[in-house]
Amino acid sequence: MKKSTLFFFLLFTIVSFAQKPCEKDPIYNQFDFWIGEWKVYDLKGNLAGQSKITKILDNCVVLEEWTSAKEQQGLLFSGKSFNSYNSATKQWQQNWIDNTGGSTEYLTGHFENDAMHFISRPFNNGGKTTSVRKLTFYKLKDGKVRQHGEISNNEGKDWVTEYDLEYRPEN
């Protein structure tokens, strides 16, 4: 009897530790409103691209796979973003990488008022200017998502819109 009790205790302990942490803590689900397959439009209603958002790595990472609708300078722009909650810093973060060699790293992010807010680390924007990017995803009431990208060239005192997109469900 003692051996079987010990066996079940050890088995329960092992199974408990084997659970996936990103499935247990609801903070990892804060960005789930973005998951889906989307047609993405600019503010004028023009199709800007398509985006597929999924969870990977045992639901710890929200992956975006973006493809633009039109070629620019002979290239169909595409990229991926990897979005995750960093439990050590208690911040959401995003890493964007694209097929032009571009990348943006957002290490400060949080979910508040039905929106995911990111700020990039400062970067050299050609020459003497240091810039910062702000990226906000708004969960809209009609099942859509708004993505608003902004840039500041004066340490966040003033912001200029780089793009403003609306994600509409494909189906």
Regions found by a protein language model. Give the residues of each.
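Bacterial Sec-dependent N-terminal signal peptides
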Residues: 1-22
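Hydrophobic small-molecule pocket/channel-lining residues, especially in calycin-type beta-barrels
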Residues: 19-171
